[in-house]
């Protein structure tokens, strides 16, 4: 497979310009205007942030992309699907309220918001996965599949289960209905190391399934209630909650890649990622820890696999921030350094599996040429 082209611009802005100007120029240079959008529905998939989290992308970025679509005659809308776990985005009404509270509305973004899998997270379409090994079909939000054109606008950051969350996670996990998310997460559930557990109850507060109790002042997980979402792993500050089966995370990664293929296959798609506020964990948390790496820039491509690879490569070259989860890990005298910022931040992850699987089934390629946009 030939190399894909990924376009990049940094966040430096001379007087008289803005990041929004640079984002628009990046998208235009990358070829967004080559897509025929006239009179067509354009789904812009992004994450509206959990209440309390402040690392999610600002609505201004969404408006920049939506405005470009409207200039081409497109009919854009922002979308995301409901969460698997209870929280502020578990149904469409609360999800929309959360989006509004975090600044996303028709005025701030220039387009409407549609929750992709409907009121209860059950409005889904069963979509074939071409060349799928782990999923023959994917359960995707109906409104997302109804769109003529698909654009992902992703916040690239760390993740406690997948290593990082970029375009493929935004698409694969994010576009899955609640049942689709469950099918992806079903491959593994966390465990507790009692020797490390301090009974602080942070994991129970983060759990959306009421699956964690403390009968002996140590966390105990009820696996009949646990959905395997992994939020408790990110909540624990003492590494007491962990994934006992590293292959479970790898299986999650590969399923996620196949779901992303189901979303993109057979229609025009374009992808943008902003590598900033690189928190160690998912934006699904109701909080965000300090960034583990400095802000890097914005990337765009027609190939989501190459895009994620380029973002990851840029992060791996960056210098860790000392006062962060990653910096603290690396400063430990007994820390086994993986020479991989994502794995050193969250050790029980296998992020390369997502890219490997996506490339294997033909969604894109990990080989890319990086072009700089000034």
Which residue stretches match the model-derived regions?
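Extended, low-polarity segments enriched in aliphatic/aromatic residues
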Residues: 2-61, 71-80, 85-374
């Amino acid at each position: 497979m030939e190399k894909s082209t990924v376009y990049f611009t940094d966040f430096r802005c001379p007087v008289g310009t803005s990041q929004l100007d640079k984002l628009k120029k990046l998208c235009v240079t990358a070829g967004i205007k080559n897509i025929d959008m006239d009179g067509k529905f354009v789904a812009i998939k992004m994450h509206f942030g959990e209440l309390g989290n402040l690392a999610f992308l600002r609505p201004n970025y969404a408006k920049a992309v939506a405005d470009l679509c409207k200039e081409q005659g497109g009919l854009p809308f922002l979308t995301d699907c409901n969460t698997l776990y209870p929280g502020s985005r578990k149904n469409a009404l609360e999800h929309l309220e959360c989006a509004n509270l975090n600044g996303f509305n028709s005025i701030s973004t220039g387009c409407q918001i549609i929750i992709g899998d409907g009121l209860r997270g059950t409005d889904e379409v069963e979509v074939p996965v071409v060349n799928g090994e782990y999923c023959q079909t994917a359960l995707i939000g109906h409104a997302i599949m109804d769109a003529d054109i698909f654009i992902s606008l992703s916040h690239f950051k760390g993740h406690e289960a997948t290593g990082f969350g970029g375009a493929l996670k935004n698409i694969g996990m994010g576009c899955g209905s609640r049942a689709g998310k469950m099918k992806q997460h079903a491959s593994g559930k966390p465990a507790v190391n009692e020797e490390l557990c301090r009974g602080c109850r942070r994991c129970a507060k983060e759990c959306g399934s009421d699956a964690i109790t403390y009968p002996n002042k140590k966390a105990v997980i009820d696996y009949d209630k646990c959905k395997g979402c992994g939020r408790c792993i990110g909540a624990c500050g003492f590494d007491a909650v962990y994934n006992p089966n590293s292959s479970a995370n790898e299986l999650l990664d590969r399923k996620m890649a196949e779901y992303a293929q189901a979303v993109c296959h057979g229609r025009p798609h374009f992808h943008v990622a902003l590598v900033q506020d690189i928190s160690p964990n998912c934006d699904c948390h109701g909080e965000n820890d300090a960034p583990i790496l400095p802000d890097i820039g914005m990337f765009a491509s027609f190939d989501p696999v190459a895009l994620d690879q380029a973002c990851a490569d840029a992060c791996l070259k960056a210098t860790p921030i000392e006062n962060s989860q990653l910096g603290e890990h690396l400063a430990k005298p007994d820390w086994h350094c993986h020479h991989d910022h994502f794995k050193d931040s969250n050790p029980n992850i296998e992020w390369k599996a997502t890219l490997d699987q996506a490339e294997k089934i033909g969604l894109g390629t990990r080989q890319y040429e990086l072009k700089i946009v000034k």
